[in-house]
A protein has these predicted regions:
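Nucleic-acid endonuclease domains
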Residues: 1-181
Length: 181
């Protein structure tokens, strides 16, 4: 019978193989989610790859240099819907952090179960539509309070849909492109 120590060592050995393949430690700050998010997005963005460095863009393509990929944990048994989709969180603890959202050329968000490699659902807003979110970003930045410490701000897919049509968003379910959630 395997002990917890044995299971962890086996897991860490496999995770080290992923680190060697991707250049990212998959368990640091949920990096495995970025790795798998990029893998799913290759259906739509064949040249997507990891951006170099731990700050700034999460991914790049041959034409996009600032793709932001966000993730959340999905603990429900049911599939996510527009109404139940988890909020997207941004750290706005520094003013420069709060304004860098205007520089995003694309935005993705995925929902992961605690044991799933692929997101059970994710979406991607590309360069033709991301600027439609600037009024939402302005609202978030205007609410920024420089006197507090770490300040997270969230918005939902319903908030996004106040600024763009559902068909402006690329949707995926269990790693496959779909028409919507």
């Amino acid at each position: 019978m395997s002990t917890n120590k044995d299971k962890i060592e086996q897991s860490l050995a496999l995770l080290e193989e992923v680190r060697k393949d991707t250049g990212q430690n998959p368990i640091h700050n949920y990096q495995y989610r970025e790795i798998m998010h990029r893998e799913v997005l290759k259906q739509y963005l064949p040249t997507i790859e990891r951006s170099v460095g731990g700050h700034g863009a999460d991914a790049v393509t041959s034409t996009l240099k600032n793709i932001e990929l966000k993730s959340s944990t999905w603990d429900r048994k049911s599939d996510p819907t527009i109404d139940t989709w988890k909020p997207i969180m941004f750290d706005m603890s520094k003013l420069k952090d709060s304004t860098k959202i205007y520089d995003y050329q694309a935005l993705g968000h995925g929902l992961w179960t605690r044991t799933g490699a692929y997101p059970i659902a994710n979406f991607f807003i590309g360069p033709n539509h991301i600027k439609k979110l600037h009024p939402l970003f302005k609202k978030l930045v205007d609410e920024y309070d420089t006197n507090t410490g770490r300040q997270d701000t969230t918005f939902t897919i319903k908030d996004i849909l106040n600024y763009m049509d559902k068909q402006d968003i690329i949707w995926f379910k269990n790693g496959q492109r779909v028409r919507g959630v």
